[in-house]
Each structure stands twice: as C-alpha cells, then as structure tokens.
Design a protein with these regions (language model features):
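C-terminal and late-domain segments of enzyme folds
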Residues: 2-37, 49-56, 136-137, 141-246
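Short glycine-rich anion-binding loops that position phosphate/pyrophosphate groups of nucleotides
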Residues: 16, 93-96, 127, 164
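Catalytic-core regions built around general acid/base machinery
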Residues: 30, 104-118
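Portal/gating segments that form or line small-molecule/metal binding sites
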Residues: 40-43, 47-98, 103
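Alpha-helix C-terminal capping/helix-to-coil transition sites in glycosyltransferase folds
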Residues: 83-84, 117, 154
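Catalytic nucleophile loop
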Residues: 89-92, 115-134
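Short, active-site-adjacent cap segments at secondary-structure transitions
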Residues: 95-96, 128-131, 200-202
C-alpha cells in the first residue's frame, strides 16, 4: 500500500498490565495520543469468558482517560456499532476463543474496513496477535476451535506477545518461545515480531515505531533473529502469504 494512501492507525500492545502497575497504565499516553479528540470506543471482549466483568474493567479504565466504551456483546447489531465507533479496542485473553468469535459473529470484515479507513485500533496481547495475518504465533491453549486461523491482516507480519528470552540457567526442558517461532518459520513465510513485556507497536500509515523500554526480537525465515528498536517501518512493506477471511 502506498504510504500516501495508508490510513492505518494502530497501537499493538504486548500486555495490558505491566508488573507493578495498573491495567493499561503503561499504555495510557500512547492510547491518548492515538485516539486524540475521539471519544467513543467499541470493545471486543471475546478473548475472555466473563465478558461482562471484562467490559466493566475496560469501561472503568478508559473512562479515566475521558473515553466512553461500549462492548459489541451488548448490542444487537455489532457491525453497525463498529461502523459508528470512533475507535476499536480488542482485548487480550485466549486467542483461539477470540478468533472463533470474530469469525462466528462476522466481525473480521467490519473491523478491517474501519481500520483501513483510518479508525484507530488498539489491540492488547491476543488483540495484537489478531492484527496480523493469523493466530499461528499464539502460545494459548486451543480451548475452542475457530473455523479458520485467519485474522484481521492489518499488518503483514505475525506478532508473538509476552516474548520471553531463553533462560540459560533454567533446567526446564520444554520448548522456548524462540524454538516455537522457529517451528512456525519452518512452515510459514511471514516475519514474526517478538514483543517483550511493556512493548507497543505504534503504526501510523506506512510508519511503525516500537515504544517501551525493551527491544523487539525479529524473526525471518532463513535468517538469524535480531534485536530491533525505534523505526520498524520496513516490516510493513512485507507481503503476507495469508490474507484475512470473513
């Protein structure tokens, strides 16, 4: 997409709560900057089982930022609510549960169309994963079976939130996150961004900047992973091999 025509405005957050801080505290300034003068936010709570409690928590937190939040699970016409909202917030939790709901409620296309038209998108954890082409880099248990692994395709790369570096002193013999990402790359072409805790990707059209105290770890098929900070815009220029599916 030509950057002059690219209206995407995304904030992709590794984790909604940082150790020692409250819900979305570390992301508040970035959220405020992203939404600007907009006031109404539509919330997608389907990554958690208790949608009422999740919505109440998000409503209270965003109200403290001067924002009015409503949830898609409280309205009769979800697509209409997405169409009318000033911003979209997809919360974290179980990615399989979230993706199943996105497909079953027909939310993939309405969300994608609005975001590509310039409506701000906030995604935390699972909500960040689904901004990519598929859910294939989630670490979550497959507690439900979605009809497809395809997600929103707002960015052409995969996201692996809560990225943990291998601990050389650990006696645990299970797979590391890096090993699992390498398994993904054995079968898939899309680049993967490992987002450490406290990290956020801020997409403004054709520009993407890493925010937060930690570098991201970038994985590409056939290449050694590397650390990256600051401007990560080149990742937006890559082509995904899997598009979104309604």
């Amino acid at each position: 997409m030509n950057s002059k025509e690219d209206r995407r405005r995304l904030l992709l957050i590794s984790n909604s709560t940082l150790h020692g801080r409250g819900y979305l505290d570390h992301a508040e300034s970035a959220i405020r900057e992203l939404v600007g003068s907009r006031k109404s936010v539509i919330f997608v709570p389907y990554a958690l089982f208790d949608r009422r409690a999740y919505t109440n928590r998000a409503q209270e937190r965003l109200a403290a930022m001067g924002l009015s939040l409503s949830s898609v699970h409280d309205v009769s016409n979800m697509a209409h609510a997405i169409q009318k909202a000033d911003a979209i917030f997809v919360g974290g939790g179980n990615t399989f549960r979230l993706v199943k709901a996105l497909h079953e409620y027909g939310l993939i296309t309405p969300i994608r169309e609005r975001v590509m038209a310039g409506v701000p998108y906030i995604g935390s954890s699972a909500g960040a994963i689904v901004a990519g082409p598929s859910l294939r880099t989630t670490k979550d248990m497959p507690v439900v079976e979605p009809p497809s692994f395809a997600t929103l395709g707002l960015v052409p790369f995969q996201i692996s939130p809560h990225y943990l570096d291998p601990d050389p002193t650990s006696t645990h013999m299970g797979e590391t996150q890096e090993e699992r990402i390498n398994q993904f790359l054995e079968e898939n072409e899309d680049a993967v961004v490992g987002l450490r805790e406290g990290s956020l990707l801020n997409v403004q059209g054709g520009t993407m900047t890493l925010l937060g105290p930690n570098a991201a770890r970038i994985f590409r098929r056939g290449n050694e992973p590397f650390e990256a900070t600051g401007d990560l815009s080149e990742l937006l220029e890559e082509s995904s091999v899997e598009g979104c599916a309604a």
